[in-house]
C-alpha cells in the first residue's frame, strides 16, 4: 500500500495546520483505519481523528470524445497536541 499520494496545499489546509490537522490525498481504495495505522507507524504520531471525503474526477475532452480523470479520496488527519508531521513533498500543478 502506498498510503499518502501527496499533501494538499490550499488556503483551508494551511489554516488547518494551526489546529494540528494535516490534509492529503490518499489512494482511493484505502480505508480510514488503514491510513490511520499507516500514519501512526510511519511518522510515529498519535492520530485522534480522521475525516475523509471522495472528490469526483474532472471531465477532460480530446476532440469530440469526452473522458474524465479518476476520482480520489482526501483525508484530514488530526493529531494529538505535541505531535507533528514533517513537511512532505507537494504535487506541483
Swiss-Prot record:
A GO term, aspect molecular function: rRNA binding
Highest rank taxon of the organism: Eukaryota
Pfam families in UniProt: Ribosomal_L23
Coiled coil: none
Keyword Ribosomal protein: yes
GO terms under biological process: translation
GO cellular-component term (any): ribosome
Cellular localisation: Plastid, Chloroplast
Entry-linked InterPro entries: Nucleotide-bd_a/b_plait_sf (IPR012677), Ribosomal_uL23-like (IPR013025), Ribosomal_uL23/eL15/eS24_sf (IPR012678), Ribosomal_uL23_CS (IPR001014)
Keywords: Chloroplast, Plastid, Ribonucleoprotein, Ribosomal protein, RNA-binding, rRNA-binding
Task of the protein: Binds to 23S rRNA.
Subunit structure: Part of the 50S ribosomal subunit.
Family to which this protein belongs: Belongs to the universal ribosomal protein uL23 family.
Protein's recorded name: Large ribosomal subunit protein uL23cz/uL23cy
Organism: Gossypium hirsutum
Amino acid at each position: 500500500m502506498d498510503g499518502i499520494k501527496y499533501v494538499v496545499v490550499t488556503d483551508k489546509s494551511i489554516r488547518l495546520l494551526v489546529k494540528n490537522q494535516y490534509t492529503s490525498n490518499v489512494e482511493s481504495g484505502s480505508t480510514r483505519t488503514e491510513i490511520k495505522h499507516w500514519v501512526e507507524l510511519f511518522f510515529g504520531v498519535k492520530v485522534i481523528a480522521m475525516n475523509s471525503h471522495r472528490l469526483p474526477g474532472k471531465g477532460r475532452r480530446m476532440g469530440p470524445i469526452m473522458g474524465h480523470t479518476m476520482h480520489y479520496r482526501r483525508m484530514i488527519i488530526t493529531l494529538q497536541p505535541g505531535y507533528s508531521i514533517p513537511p512532505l513533498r507537494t504535487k506541483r500543478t
